[in-house]
Amino acid sequence: MPIGVPKVPFRNPGEDDISWIDVYNRLYRERLLFLGQEVESEISNQLIGLMIYLSIEDENKDLYFFINSPGGWVLPGIAIYDTMQFVPPEVHTICLGLAASMGSFILVGGTITKRLAFPHARVMIHQPAAAFYEAQAGEFVMEAEELLKLREIITKVYVQRTGKPLWVVSEDLERDVFMSATEAQTHGIVDLVAVQ
């Protein structure tokens, strides 16, 4: 039987009564964001909304973005990345568990010097994929062109944010490349590995 989202006690400033709110709401109030699922439009919009709201509330207080994601859709992931670059607060990205595909793209998008992986975390990068098998010939060509544009965007971001040469990033994106936290640090995807 699923337990649902745990509830925690919370007292609003200046109030005597305690109310019970879900744990994520409580953590959002502390500027802690979580991506613990596949990247798709709904979670992307929620995280974008939270980042914008929290930056309006206090543009000088950092955001902490925890990632444990198998990846997901490219455009919703790029939207999260773009928002991270747009909002005034610095965004710390923290990988726990797995940051694969779009999860690693979001991880690398954190403020440089403030990207961290837990010691047993795994990171995976690869090129974007599409479902060509159902497309008509004309759609196939258009989708291939769009995919090339997206690959170019993703490659440029990894080059810019990791400091690796274009040829290294391009070669790595050709296949699934899994990394330990230390390897991700060497690769420039994270800046620090948390100590045990």
From Swiss-Prot:
Major subcellular location class: plastid
Gene Ontology MF annotations: ATP-dependent peptidase activity; ATPase binding; serine-type endopeptidase activity
Intracellular or extracellular location(s): Plastid, Chloroplast stroma
Catalytic activity, EC: 3.4.21.92
GO cellular component, one term: endopeptidase Clp complex
Catalytic residues (UniProt): 101, 126
UniProt keywords, alphabetically: Chloroplast, Hydrolase, Plastid, Protease, Serine protease
InterPro entries according to UniProt: ClpP, ClpP/crotonase-like_dom_sf, ClpP/TepA, ClpP_His_AS, ClpP_Ser_AS
One Pfam family here: CLP_protease
Catalytic activity: Hydrolysis of proteins to small peptides in the presence of ATP and magnesium. alpha-casein is the usual test substrate. In the absence of ATP, only oligopeptides shorter than five residues are hydrolyzed (such as succinyl-Leu-Tyr-|-NHMec, and Leu-Tyr-Leu-|-Tyr-Trp, in which cleavage of the -Tyr-|-Leu- and -Tyr-|-Trp bonds also occurs)
Any one Gene Ontology BP term: protein quality control for misfolded or incompletely synthesized proteins
Family as reported in the entry's similarity comment: Belongs to the peptidase S14 family.
Primary role: Cleaves peptides in various proteins in a process that requires ATP hydrolysis. Has a chymotrypsin-like activity. Plays a major role in the degradation of misfolded proteins.
Quaternary structure and partners: Component of the chloroplastic Clp protease core complex.
Protein name per the record: ATP-dependent Clp protease proteolytic subunit
